[in-house]
C-alpha cells in the first residue's frame, strides 16, 4: 500500500477502469502522464513509483507511445517500463526500444479470430531488479511463501536468465489470483499465432490503402 505507477493517459478503457478503481481499492495509486512529452513521466515520479506503463499503439487514440524516451527515464530512476503491445505484434518490438516487460491481449491480433480470451507477459530479461532494492522491494525481500526466496537474486542463479518478473508472476500471482488459460483456449490461440506475421503484413497493407484513399 502507498506505492504508485505512472501510466500514459492514452489507454484502453478497461485498463483505465482497473487503474482508477480496482488498484486504488488495493492501495495502489496510478498517476496519469500525457505521453506527448515523455518528461511528464519523470515529473510524476517519486520514491514510491514502482513502474511506468503505456500502450505502444493505444486504443482508441492510435498516438504512438514514446517507448525509448520513457524507458530511458525509467532506467535513470530504476523504474521498469511495461508496454501493452496488443495493437502491434510483430510490427512493433518494445523490448528492442528499452521496455522491460511486454504484455499482449492474445484475443486480438495474435489469435486473430476472437474465439478465446487470454493474455501473455514477456519479461525482456534486461532490467536490473536488484540495483535499487528500495525501489523494487518485491524482488529484493524474502518471500515467506517460497521459503524466503529473494526473486531478484535467486531466479538468475537458478535459471541462468534474468527473468524474476516472469517467474514471480507465474509462481506467485498465478497461484494466488488465477487467470490460467484452459488447454483448449491455448490450442485455439496457437492456431492463430501460426499466421500472425502474415496477417499483420496484410493489415498494414490494407491500412495503407485506406490512408491513401482518404488523402485523395
Task: Locate predicted features.
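Conserved PLP-enzyme active-site core in the AAT-like
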Residues: 1-215
